[in-house]
């Protein structure tokens, strides 16, 4: 079981966040609306989520290249994005290599209905707890800031599901902290996550579910 911590998101642009201001504004009512993952979360007010979820090549193009080179993906590699949203990353995978076979699932009906035209036929409504594909279906399975939106037992199940459908590589990013200050910021910043913990606890959780892929963290900073 290789299981390694690696930042494959180092090419993803980091937005400037005023954590303290946001923490003071977010209320439980905002979290309740955000966790429905409907229009308000993607394209509503910033307090409910993205505040406008639109495609821009600067977000995923370099990260897609990073994935492709790191995992040495072949010309006909199959890639699954769990929590694909409107399919932006899948679009950039196909821009990088038109022979890649891509697929995406998202719990949000709104996101799937508003997916980019270029990938609409490759995405579907789906749950990370019950990934609608056969065992060993994909060369690379990616889940970025998604499985932590599940309760703990469901989160464990989603990790097992990722392991099941991946025949070679997988990469997961989850909300986490390394110290008390980061924990305080995360608890205030978080809108949708239901499972979040110290990085060491995540590592133990991955091992307990026999996860053999790679992982990294979203740290509120």
Residues covered by each model-derived region:
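Short catalytic micro-motifs in class I SAM-dependent methyltransferases
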Residues: 145-149
């Amino acid at each position: 079981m290789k299981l390694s911590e690696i930042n494959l998101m180092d090419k993803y642009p980091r937005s400037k966040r005023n954590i303290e201001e946001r923490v003071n504004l977010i209320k439980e009512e905002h979290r309740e609306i955000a966790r429905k993952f409907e229009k308000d979360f993607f394209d509503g007010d910033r307090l409910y989520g993205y505040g406008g979820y639109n495609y821009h090549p600067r977000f995923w193009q370099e990260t897609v290249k990073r994935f492709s080179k790191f995992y040495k993906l072949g010309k006909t590699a199959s890639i699954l994005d769990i929590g694909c949203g409107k399919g932006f990353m899948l679009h950039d995978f196909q821009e990088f290599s038109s022979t890649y076979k891509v697929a995406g699932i998202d719990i949000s009906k709104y996101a799937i209905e508003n997916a980019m035209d270029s990938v609409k036929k490759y995405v579907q409504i789906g749950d990370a707890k019950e990934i609608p594909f056969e065992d060993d279906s994909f060369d690379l399975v990616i889940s970025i800031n998604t499985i932590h939106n599940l309760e703990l037992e469901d989160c464990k199940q989603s990790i097992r599901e990722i392991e099941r459908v991946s025949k070679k590589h997988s990469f997961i990013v989850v909300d986490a902290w390394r110290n008390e200050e980061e924990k305080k910021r995360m608890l205030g910043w978080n809108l949708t996550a239901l499972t979040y913990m110290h990085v060491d606890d995540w590592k133990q959780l991955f091992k307990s579910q026999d996860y053999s892929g790679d992982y990294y963290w979203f740290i509120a900073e």
